[in-house]
Amino acid sequence: MTDARQAASRRAVLFGATAIGLCAVWTRTADAEEATLTPDAALAKVQSGEILLIDVRTPDEWARTGLPEGGTALDMRRDDFTQALLALAEGQTDRPIALICASGGRSGHMTRELSRAGFTRIIDVPEGMLGSRAGPGWLERGLPVTQP
């Protein structure tokens, strides 16, 4: 093979590798963007049965503010949290599950932890119940709550 052909072949390989790498980055970015919901979207999806909405806050917090309508209370401090969540998801680690807390910190943390534990469709509601940098939150948006 001539030097010119070898150089052209190397460029083609590098171009292909770069294109594949860019596609992988784009795909991961798209997945990350899909892994959050606004409170309005979470309410719509829980009402339509598309997601299981889990409030990971404490019983004291639930008593003060109520639970998001359609949500299930599951204190993230429970020793059996993962097993209890799996039971609520009827054993389906691929079931879409949205997590909400007060302001997005704990739900974000648990989103990562549950993904590491094998759950494949965990979604964060980063505004939380009280609001955060992500937005005003469930309560400020005037979304419905139920008492625990």
Would you name each region that the model predicts?
Residues I100:
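Short, surface-exposed ligand- or partner-binding patches at beta-edge/loop junctions that are enriched
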